[in-house]
Amino acid sequence: MLQSPSSPYPRTITLIGMMGVGKSTIGRRLASQLNMPFSDSDLEIEEAAGQSITEIFARYGENYFRNGERRVISRLIAGEPKVLAVGGGAFMDEETRKLVLEKTLAIWVKADIDTLAERVTKQADRPLLIGHDVRTRLQELADIRDSFYAMAPLHVWTGAQPHEEIVDAIIMALPR
């Protein structure tokens, strides 16, 4: 594990990527190593709405959710620098994507489809996967999203390696 920097990173670091890639887990560890606060936009949305994301999708639909997501992410970015994990679809919204790319350091956290499928099948709370073959649906989403995620200036692969190694790789790649 790398020595923690003496001061936090001066900008918000936003972790983007597919569901199940580990943005929240890696984000918490990265924030700890950088002496920064951590926020997860999905958790912030659930807290603000008093409902789970699955419930929001079921009651109001994806467009309603994305509008709320945009507002929450905008508020989080406007605050103090932090490590921010955003939902897999957040970066598909043009306004959110522009804000993330202009105001934060975006890092695309990547994993292969088989790894993602293995991780998300353990979780029942993924509204975009309900009623679908998980691997097929993840591939469809990746086919749509990857070209947008690729706009992030930093990319990091995840897989079987320990989260500490991924965090160390991110810290070493941070522009200073």
Curated annotation (Swiss-Prot):
The keyword Phosphoprotein does not apply. It comes from the Bacteria. Its main location: cytoplasm. The keyword ATP-binding applies. Keywords: Amino-acid biosynthesis, Aromatic amino acid biosynthesis, ATP-binding, Cytoplasm, Kinase, Nucleotide-binding, Transferase. GO terms for molecular function: ATP binding; magnesium ion binding; shikimate kinase activity. It catalyses: shikimate + ATP = 3-phosphoshikimate + ADP + H(+). Pfam families: SKI. ATP binds at residues 17-24. GO terms for cellular component: cytosol. GO terms for biological process: amino acid biosynthetic process; aromatic amino acid family biosynthetic process; chorismate biosynthetic process. PROSITE patterns: SHIKIMATE_KINASE. Pathway: Metabolic intermediate biosynthesis; chorismate biosynthesis; chorismate from D-erythrose 4-phosphate and phosphoenolpyruvate: step 5/7. HAMAP family: Shikimate_kinase (MF_00109). NCBIfam families: PRK13946.1. This is Shikimate kinase. It comes from Zymomonas mobilis subsp. mobilis (strain ATCC 31821 / ZM4 / CP4).
